[in-house]
Design a protein with these regions (language model features):
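N-terminal accessory segments
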Residues: 9-13, 17
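Glycine-rich flavin
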Residues: 38-48, 52-125
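A generic secondary-structure micro-motif detector
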Residues: 31-33, 63
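Intrinsic disorder at enzyme termini
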Residues: 1-9
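N-terminal capping segment at the start of a domain
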Residues: 20-30
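Short, flexible segments with low predicted structural confidence
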Residues: 16-19, 49
Length: 125
């Protein structure tokens, strides 16, 4: 049940995430969790599908997705592989922080490469 009316674009993103999760993440999830390994192959699948720059603004080559769309995508991924969804969400959070008020250096070395899928970002607590 959705409490927010979803645009067609949001529904399309949600379906794409569900398809990727079923096709790519589900088959690796049990092994990733059993061995406690980093879900590199699953994250690479998200990168190949163009989701790496989800929270990077369109101005800097990203998708410029809003928070609701982001939540829909992460929710679908987590249904098949919570580990991948968590790592991906950490990347998105760091990307959003860097993209808020980036310097020219950050745009060139982090933001634009993130949008292209060349850089993985994360945060530490």
């Amino acid at each position: 049940m959705n409490y927010f009316p979803l645009s067609q674009q949001q529904q399309d993103w949600q379906q794409l995430a569900a398809d990727i999760a079923s096709r790519e993440l589900g088959q690796r999830a049990q092994e990733t969790d059993r061995t406690g390994t980093y879900p590199k192959d699953s994250l690479d699948a998200l990168r190949r599908e163009g989701l790496w720059g989800l929270r990077v603004s369109k101005e800097h080559g990203g998708l410029g997705a809003d928070m609701l769309t982001t939540c829909l995508i992460v929710e679908e991924l987590s249904k098949k592989c919570p580990s991948t969804a968590m790592c991906y969400k950490m990347h998105l959070e760091a990307a959003e922080i860097i993209c808020r008020i980036p310097t020219t250096y950050q745009i060139e070395h982090f933001v634009e490469p993130m949008a292209k899928g060349e850089v993985f970002s994360t945060i530490a607590g």
